[in-house]
Amino acid sequence: MANSKSAKKRALQSEKRRQHNASRRSMLRTYVKRVIAAIKSGDHKAATEAFAIAQPIVDRMATKGLIHKNKAGRQKARLNAKIKAIAA
């Protein structure tokens, strides 16, 4: 338990950040799941549209430090490859 005034403040800030990050991480997962659902349905147009919406969100979360930039790149590359496989 935090005892000093500064430690209590840090604990409050950490909790606030944890909740904010959890919300953003949930939002990120939701948009990625929408792309995956569109891919599984086999609808190329819907998958492309969902990916166009999800892509900047993935990038934004990487710049905010919520996910690693390599993970963001890997996620986008894999989703894009699956979308291209539908079209072929």
Curated annotation (Swiss-Prot):
Query: Keywords assigned by UniProt?
Result: Ribonucleoprotein, Ribosomal protein, RNA-binding, rRNA-binding
Which residues pair up as cystines?
A: none
User: Would you kindly state one Gene Ontology biological process term found in this protein's UniProt entry?
Assistant: translation
The entry's cellular-component GO terms read: cytosol; small ribosomal subunit
Cleavable signal peptide = none
Q: Which family does it belong to?
A: Belongs to the bacterial ribosomal protein bS20 family.
Role:
Binds directly to 16S ribosomal RNA.
This chain belongs to the protein called Small ribosomal subunit protein bS20
State the organism of origin: Shewanella frigidimarina (strain NCIMB 400)
